[in-house]
């Protein structure tokens, strides 16, 4: 069954955003990579500002999608900057992902979180699986948004 899953879905990105008791935010991303990939290829996950970014003045962001396009537009950093300038994390993520789509036909997904605990799971891909835990409550559907 694991081989079937891998052959259909490949190695997917796992991302996380978190907030501590003092209101500091953090983001992390890990990826199985794009297949087939060139030897030495580095995707967006380890690139700060590309696929992962966190700034207490804006928001924490973890991205998934075609890394080269995400890096080229520094999407995670852009989302945080829009948030810092006053947009909600949902509006900030939507604006940045739409710019990526319109500018270079880049498709991506993001999870975002700011210091106030406002979060968003958003994507322009065919699908994106995500979840959110706040305390002992788990939420997904009310904040999961697809942009076209």
Identify the meaning behind each predicted range:
Residues 1-148:
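N-terminal nucleophile
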């Amino acid at each position: 069954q694991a081989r079937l899953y891998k052959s259909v879905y490949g190695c997917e990105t796992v991302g996380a955003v978190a907030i501590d008791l003092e209101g500091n935010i953090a983001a992390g991303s890990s990826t199985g990579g794009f297949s087939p990939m060139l030897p030495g290829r580095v995707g967006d996950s380890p690139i700060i500002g590309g696929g992962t970014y966190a700034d207490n003045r804006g928001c924490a962001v973890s991205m998934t999608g075609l890394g080269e396009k995400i890096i080229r537009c520094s999407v995670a950093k852009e989302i945080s900057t829009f948030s810092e300038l006053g947009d909600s994390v949902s509006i900030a993520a939507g604006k940045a992902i739409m710019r990526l789509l319109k500018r270079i036909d880049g498709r991506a997904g993001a999870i975002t979180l700011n210091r106030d605990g406002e979060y968003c799971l958003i994507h322009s891909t065919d699908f994106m699986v995500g979840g959110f835990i706040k305390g002992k409550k788990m939420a997904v559907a009310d904040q999961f948004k697809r942009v076209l």
